[in-house]
Each structure stands twice: as C-alpha cells, then as structure tokens.
C-alpha cells in the first residue's frame, strides 16, 4: 500500500479538525500557516492529544485538568509529554529507544515538521480508534529502560513480571471484546424479535379497527342520511331568513345614502360626523374580518363531505351487511359496549349549543338592524328640523362663503400669520412716517420754488404764511416761518445758505430712506404672496373637503357591500357547521376510542419495559467495564484453584487405584 502524501495528510488533518469535538472551520491555508509556527502547531497538537489522552475508567468521574498552554519556554517539555503516549500510533510493533524519542521530539518542534503532520493525521484519521489504541498501549508496550540498567537482576525480574501481567491484560481484553460483541449480538436479536412481535400486534390491531369501522358504516349511513335531510331543510330556511335580512339591509343602505346626499351643515360638524362614522366603520370592519377568519377556518371540513350517491349506496348495502353487524356487536360486547345514553346526551348538548349560537347570531343581526333604523330616523328628523328652521338659500350661500379649512392647515396658517403680524405692523408704521415726511418735503419744495419769485417782485419784503421748524426728531431743518421780516440782500444770502443746507439734508435723507423704501416694497410683495398662498390653501382645503366627502361616501358603500358579502359568508358558515356536525357524528361512531386507548396503554407499557431493560443492560455493561480487571484476576484465581483441585482429585484417584492394586496383590499373595 502506498504511503499517504503530505497533501493527503493535510487533508486528513483538516477534515478531522472540522468535525466534533473540535469544529475549528479549518482550511488548508490556515492549517499550513499554523504548522509553520512551532508554538501554534504544538498548541494544536496539545488540543488534539487532550482528546485521546490515556486515563483509566475510574478517572471518568473525576475532574481532569484542562489542556496545557504552549509557549516558547515549555515547547520541548510539552512535545516530550505528548510523544510518550502518542508514538504508539506510528508503529505498534516497534519499541522505540530513548534516543529515537529524543530525535523525534527535536524534529517535532521544528517549523513545518513532517513528524507533526504524520502524528496529527494518525490521531485524527480515527479519533475513537486512536483513543482505544493509546489506552491499550499504556499496558501493552514495554517501558523504555536504559541499557546500563538492563544487567540488574531485579530489573530483569520486574520485566518478566510485567510481561506476564501484560499477557494477562491482553487475554482479559480479548475476552472482554468477545463478551461485548456477544452481548451486542444478543441484544440486537432480542430487539429484532421484539420489533417483529410489536409489528404483528400493530397489524392485528389495525385490522380490527378497520373491521370495526367497516361494520359500523351501514347503520350510521341511514342515520346520517336522515339527519342530512333535516339539516338541508334547516339550511334552506336559514337562507330564506338571511335573504330577507339582506333586503332589509339594502333598504337601510338606500336610506343612509339619501341621508348622506341630503345632509347639510357647517364644515366642522360634517367633519366631526364623518370622523365618528369613519371610526365606527373601521371598528365594524375589524369585527367583520375576525368573523370572516373564524368562518373560513371551517371551510376545510366541506372537502370530506359524503355525497348523496355515497349515502344511497350505503343504504342499498345495509341489508347485505346485517350479518357482519351482528358479529361486530358480539365482538364489541367482549371488549365493552359504548354507553348509548352518554352518546345521546352528548349529541343533544351539541345540538343545543348550535341552536343557541344561531339564536345569538339572529339576535345580533336584529339589534344591528334596529340600530340602523333608529339612526336613519334620527338623521331624517335632524334634516327635517334644519330644513324647517333655516332658509336653505341663505344657508347654502353661507356655506359657499365659509372657509372650510381643515384644523391642522388652519393652525399652520394661523401660526404663520401671527409670526408676520409684527413685521406688517412695523412696515405700516414706517409707511405712515414716510408719508408724513414726504408731505413735509413737498411743502418745502413748494416754498423754495416760490422764493425766487418773491425776491424778484419784492426784494425788500417777502411775506409768507409758512415758517421754519425742526422736524424728524431734530435731525433736519425745514422752512418754518417766512414772513414778518423783509428780505434784503443779506437775508437773501442767508436764506440761500439755509436752503442749500436744507437741500443737502434732504438728499442725505433720501439716501437714508432708500433701503427702507426697498424693504417696504419687499414687505408689500411678501404680504401679497402670503395672501395668494392663503387663498390657494383655502381653495385646496375646499377641494380636499369635497374629495373627503366623496371618499367617505365610497367607503360607506364599500362597507355595505362587505356587510352583504359577510352575510353570504355567514350563510356558508352555517352550512359548514351543519356539515361539520354530520362529519363529527360519523367519526364518533366510526372510531373505537376505548379499544384504541387500551392498545395504546399496552404498547406504551411494553415500550417502557423495553426501555427499562435497555437501561439495565447499559448499567450492567458499565459495571462490567469498571469491574473487568478485578473479574479477570478472580477468573485467573478460580482457574488456578480449579486446576489445583483437579490435580488433587487426580492424585486421590491415583492413590485409590494404587491402594486397590496393592489389596489385589495382597489377596493374590495370600491365595498363593
């Protein structure tokens, strides 16, 4: 056989490390990196060797130390300790010397060691077999003794005793393996026999149950046929009642449509009423959805409904199966007949429950119809009251002029208007101030334009009703008083100087007021934009209100349609309940519950007995494993005692034969 290559060894190591109890998720690249690092490679070997370390069976219950942590300081020490009990996996027939083991250890601690790959692959190839081999080798392999001590006679004596003990251990081990193999084979044979017995009993029980079902079908078929006819008649009556209720619902729906179309009121009242109606409809839809889910869960029972043809066939076969029915009754009497009175009571209680349920549903439908009629009457009365107390033309005009803005949108616009109110007030104040100053400037220009005419016509006298007075908070001067004093040349020069100063002040004032004028224009544009936005939002709110009313109307129509559909589903659910009742009665009569329970208890008790026997066998096996060395020693001792007793018996027989021969010789001598 060709030895494995390094690639095969690496693949074996990788596969072994990916299996329990390691589960390292190792790859060839990761393993190669680990093997190139001596410390990591030795740590991996220590973890693997920890799973196959030699320990006696008595040490299983004791706490064992965890695997060692490898570092550069204890590298050779750990390698030597692992090599002592794992080297047996490499060559079982060769006893290695101390020098060979030292060379093996020195090569084991190298980077990418071949011995490391060989040792890991040998352990991980079969972990259970490696563990057993190492355990057995602890007792079978001879110890490594230096050659200097081999000449000692005491060492030779101890070695001979060790070889004898190892031979006894090998013999006991082989006997134990034979015993375990025999016990396993016996256990397998016993389990196979038990399985065959149980399968035979199960088949017999199944045959009896099938026979019981076949014999109970004809009698039950007649009863089912009669009950089915009664149930179908009840279903037809229920359909008639539900159709009449649907007609009443349609009338209520038409009345509700008329109320919705004729309703008038403020937008707030309409919105509040619509929200309340929407909440009520949502809750009703949730309740109806739950009822639909409950009724749909019973739809699968319709699939197993017996057809009319099958029932008629059962009725025709009734006469031919009467003899079999007599046999079935005799068989049932041996097992135990079912209590007919209990069955009748159960059927009556079930029918009473179904009748109560149908009455409850009918009462609920009547209550809902009464509530719908009462609400319709209230709405009609409210509409009539409003129409009688209010002029419809003026009411429609007020509704058209009213801003029907939703509450959230109205609050948003109100907050924006409140934020812009201080800016608007400031702009209006500044606009008023500018108007006053503009009037003053216009008046001053008129006065200044009149001054040259006055100086030309009356250079000595100039009268005017106006005058100079400071304005604008003391920041500028204007003409306040021109009159009462004659204008001469000197006064004219002073007036020109004053006018020049006034002109400069006016120009400076215009430059100062230019930003404020532009800001005022921007504020005006912003106010105009805000008014346009408000108008557009109002228009949008009106559109949303109209669309919302249409959506509410459509939602009501869809809810009414769903109610009609739910009524149909209720009808189908009632039909399903009746059919389910028929099927349940058929199943109750067909199944022999008592026989099934008794057989189930018997099978369960037998399974428990088998489990108890298996547990006892396992306990005996564990006890045998623990007491194997002592028993083997006792076996040897008993064999020695038996051989001694046989030798003594044989010696006694030989002495008796010698004594008898001597007696015969004495008789012969006496006779002669």
Swiss-Prot record:
GO terms for molecular function: tubulin binding. GO terms for cellular component: 9+2 motile cilium; axoneme; ciliary basal body; ciliary pocket collar; ciliary tip; cilium; intraciliary transport particle B. One of its GO terms (biological process) is intraciliary transport involved in cilium assembly. Keywords: Cell projection, Cilium, Cilium biogenesis/degradation, Coiled coil, Cytoplasm, Cytoskeleton, Flagellum. InterPro entries: IFT81, IFT81_CH, IFT81_N_sf. It is found in: Cell projection, Cilium, Flagellum; Cytoplasm, Cytoskeleton, Flagellum axoneme; Cytoplasm, Cytoskeleton, Flagellum basal body. Residues 155-182, 235-382, 492-572 form a coiled coil. Residues 7-139 are annotated as: CH (calponin-homology)-like region. The CH (calponin-homology)-like region shows high similarity to a CH (calponin-homology) domain and mediates binding to the globular domain of tubulin. Component of the intraflagellar transport complex B (IFT-B) involved in flagellar assembly. Belongs to the IFT81 family. This is Intraflagellar transport protein 81. It comes from Giardia intestinalis (strain ATCC 50803 / WB clone C6) (Giardia lamblia).
